[in-house]
């Protein structure tokens, strides 16, 4: 059924094809979980190589990548590049959330139905002035999403903040989720 989904953007279609090509030898959910975990570890290590967590992160990274052939590992890198390309072409989207839902990976038992980006954009547009006021008064402001999914609301808030020219150093975005993979997508 997930193969029948048609995505609107070239990067999403390419991502879907690569994802499904990895699912010949591995279960869909495992490929997604492994890809998201590896991508999150790569981002975390690129930002902070001195953390006490770096060694355990790299150990997890290696144990995941050992399951995949060199060609499959290369597809992980290509999939990450497609996400970057997609977000650079259009930052006003929830690339991973749309992929997650479109590939049929949500878990209705956990209540995983991601809010569409258009709804998140509307909420962000309504909320941004109050956040901007708080940042101006206190020198900083935060936005917390306690069930962040792939982070669509936080992405929309960030995009609204950019449009309002709110200094990024005055904002703290926090995303949490009961599902580790969803939190790593954020």
Predicted regions and their residues:
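Short, solvent-exposed secondary-structure capping/transition elements
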Residues: 48-52, 108, 132-136
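Residue-identity detector for glycine
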Residues: 86, 97, 102-104, 111, ...
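Short, charged/polar micro-motifs that form catalytic or ligand-binding hotspots
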Residues: 22-29, 109-114, 143, 147, ...
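A short N-terminal interaction module
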Residues: 1-101
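Class I SAM-dependent transferase core
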Residues: 94-129
